[in-house]
Amino acid sequence: MISVCIATYNGAAFIEEQLKSILSQLSSVDEVVISDDGSTDGTTDIICRIKDERIRLLPSYESLGSTGNFFRAIDASKGDIIFLADQDDVWLSGRVERCLKELETADLVVTDCAVTDEGLNVVYPSLFRLYGLRQGLLHNLLRCGYYGSLMAMRRSVVERARPWPENELLKHDWWLGMVAEKTGRVRFVSDKQYVLYRRHEGTETQVSKSLFKRSNRSLKTKIMARLSMAREIRNKR
């Protein structure tokens, strides 16, 4: 069984398109678990209108934040294979099939994507090439290549990643990726792009060619996050 976990917050503009791109690749026994963080723009109404039994919308809570919202969705999931998805992207055909194939011999998979603008016009054809994303514990400690919207994993990764870190600097995708690097097998799939990674003014993660511009956090905060990650991941087995 596959569980696709989505954290939503005021995603009314794009959530329907994303859900359709995901549902078209799932079987009748799979699920999409959505945790909403108190949207006020009708996001949950749009989700309910789709009326697909595979969608499980959790009761809305406020102020969990992106990481807490994703952890909540993951905790509610039931699948042996877990995908993470953002509310504003689009999955391209063949993504689920390719990830399942790679997960036969890996614990966590990251697939490449094309970076687009709000209208899905391609801005960068490959996020991997733009940032030099690849596996490697030290590499991803210094420059995180774990984008949740590009990740799929075995449930065993989630079990090893618990308990979830209380430090807010350790984001859900970075934490899961680093745990998989430390305790299992990770694969970055670079030969094809399987997601349209939509960037617009409302997205939390921005795209820049600068090393420390993945987010708007200060350089000091980013250094503190890396030190915290090094301490937390050291004892994971």
Model-derived regions: residue spans:
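Short, well-formed alpha-helical segments that are part of the catalytic scaffolds
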Residues: 11-24
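Acidic helix N-cap motif at the loop->helix transition within catalytic regions
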Residues: 14-16, 40-49, 94
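A conserved acidic beta->alpha catalytic loop
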Residues: 21, 36-45, 62
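Short beta-strand/loop segment that forms part of the nucleotide-sugar
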Residues: 29-38, 58-60
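Glycine-rich, basic loop-to-helix element that forms the pyrophosphate-binding segment
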Residues: 60-77
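Short aromatic/hydrophobic "clamp" motif used to bind/position activated sugar donors
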Residues: 82
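Conserved donor NDP-sugar-binding/catalytic core segment of glycosyltransferases
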Residues: 96-123
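Conserved nucleotide-sugar donor-binding catalytic segment
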Residues: 135-208
